[in-house]
Curated annotation (Swiss-Prot):
Keywords: Aminoacyl-tRNA synthetase, ATP-binding, Cytoplasm, Ligase, Nucleotide-binding, Protein biosynthesis. Belongs to the class-II aminoacyl-tRNA synthetase family. Type-1 seryl-tRNA synthetase subfamily. PROSITE patterns: AA_TRNA_LIGASE_II. Catalyzes the attachment of serine to tRNA(Ser). Is also able to aminoacylate tRNA(Sec) with serine, to form the misacylated tRNA L-seryl-tRNA(Sec), which will be further converted into selenocysteinyl-tRNA(Sec). Consists of two distinct domains, a catalytic core and a N-terminal extension that is involved in tRNA binding. GO terms for biological process: selenocysteine biosynthetic process; seryl-tRNA aminoacylation. The keyword Transferase does not apply. GO terms for molecular function: ATP binding; serine-tRNA ligase activity. L-serine binds at T242, A243, E244, E296, S396. It holds the Pfam family tRNA-synt_2b. This is Serine--tRNA ligase. Homodimer. The tRNA molecule binds across the dimer. The keyword Protein biosynthesis applies.
Length: 435
């Protein structure tokens, strides 16, 4: 969430910055609530001051033998106490309304982020690799997978429903190999610590990284049992939409020593998304699934280091594509296309031959102190007493299913076989082709 001080002391400036991303801040309502807060706060402080002043008179009355006077003052204090409690409740109610406003407000975009409305206004930064030309009719990854017997969408529909997949044989092994290669690269060369985390999280975790309260409809939620099981209280949990949630929340409610920053973590997990609002989009194939695997990259940094860390983290995701020899382009998202909690985001888009276009395969974001404030994730500088908020960053390094799509389609050969990228062959038992 944003620093509430911005809404109190820089309201108009903050509203103008948020307008860049198409968000209309209800300035008048916030201003009225802030005026109420100030007024009630003054009343609370005056009542506290009066009560404290009168309380001192009790001792004086008792010392003078004026018990009746002392009792009268006690009655006054009781009345003041009741009035004070009532005003505190009023103050809490106004503060709750202000907090509710704050929770619905997205992050402020960085100054250098291009203005725009949607993905059409994103700005291309660079390209790597040249799309291949083929002298035979291209097949998409669905046809390639079904022809090889490795992608079974029909069985997935029978077992669960649409937007799920069953993989078999060499296709399942390729999927595993991609994730293993990514983890090895990030841990052995890029300095990340591999994490194994829960796939179910509580609402506090989802609040911390910004999925709640705004994006609950995008999640899969469990229904708590009506009674205890193994002495555990019933609780509602949610399947993770990304490993960003459990991994970033590892620093929730902690104070890290400056010397221990940056913290760099990676995790391979399944991700679960309802894909609310995507009806009719990418209904064929592996591009948009309810369940998909992803290798996530997370960095926790000092404030002054986070923009440099964003470039580094994005470069780590790019390295995966380069080693797999997959053509891609890098774009910076415009203000209108960025995620709710992001201050700046790069997308990496891989070439998908059958669609003759680039498709997103990684999104790398600097969340600034937006998540840290929600999580109370802080660090303490050497020699300082007061802790500061960390900055958090995350990115896909990469989405495994979409990487598989790119490999299948870019590496297909005229006879229907798929050439396995050189860096993956050791994970595939030395095989050079599928099929």
């Amino acid at each position: 969430m944003l620093d509430s001080k911005l809404l109190r002391t820089e309201l108009d400036e903050t509203a103008a910055k948020l307008a860049r991303r198409g968000f209309k801040l209800d300035v008048e309502t916030i201003r009225k609530l802030e005026e109420q807060r100030k007024s009630i706060q003054v009343e609370v402080e005056n009542l506290q001051s009066t009560r404290n002043s009168i309380s001192k008179q009790i001792g004086q009355k008792m010392a003078a033998g004026d018990k009746e006077g002392a009792e009268e003052i006690k009655k006054q204090i009781g009345t003041l106490g009741s009035d004070l409690d009532a005003k505190k409740v009023e103050l809490e109610q106004v503060m709750a309304q202000l907090d509710e406003f704050t929770l619905s407000v997205p992050n402020i975009p960085a100054d250098e982020v291009p203005d725009g409305k949607d993905e059409n206004d994103n700005v291309e930064i660079s390209r790597w690799g040249e799309p291949k030309t083929y002298d035979f009719d291209l097949k998409d990854h669905v046809d390639l997978g079904e022809m090889g017997g490795g992608l079974d969408f029909a069985s997935a529909v029978k077992i669960t429903g649409a937007r799920f997949i069953v993989m078999k044989g060499q296709f399942a092994r390729l999927h595993r190999a991609i994730a293993q290669f990514m983890l090895d690269l990030h841990t052995e060369e890029h300095g990340y610590t591999e994490m194994y985390v829960p796939y179910l999280v509580n609402s506090d975790s989802l609040f911390g990284t910004g999925q709640l309260p705004k994006f609950g409809k995008d999640l899969f939620h469990t229904e708590p049992l009506a009674e205890k099981v193994n002495d555990e209280e019933p609780r509602k949990l949610s399947l993770i939409p990304t490993a960003e949630v459990p991994v970033t929340n590892l620093v929730r409610d902690t104070i890290t020593d400056e010397a221990d920053l940056p913290i760099k973590m990676t995790a391979h997990t399944p991700c679960f998304r309802s894909e609310a609002g995507s009806y009719g989009r990418d209904t064929r194939g592996l591009i948009r699934m309810h369940q998909f695997d992803k290798v996530e990259l997370v960095q926790i940094t000092k404030p002054e280091d986070s923009m440099t860390a964003l470039e580094e983290l994005t470069g780590h995701a790019e390295k995966v594509l380069q080693l797999l020899e997959l053509p891609y382009r890098k774009v910076v998202l415009c203000t209108g296309d960025m995620g709710f909690g992001a201050r700046k985001t790069y997308d990496l888009e891989v070439w998908v031959p059958a669609q003759e276009t680039y498709r997103e395969i990684s999104s790398c974001s600097n969340m600034w102190d937006f998540q840290a404030r929600r999580m109370q994730a802080r660090f303490r500088r050497k020699g300082e007493k007061k802790p500061e908020l960390v900055h958090t960053l995350n990115g896909s390094g990469l989405a495994v299913g979409r990487t598989m799509v790119a490999i299948l389609e870019n590496n297909q050969e005229a006879d229907g076989r798929i050439a396995i990228p050189a860096v993956l062959q050791k994970y595939m038992g030395g095989a050079t082709h599928i099929g």
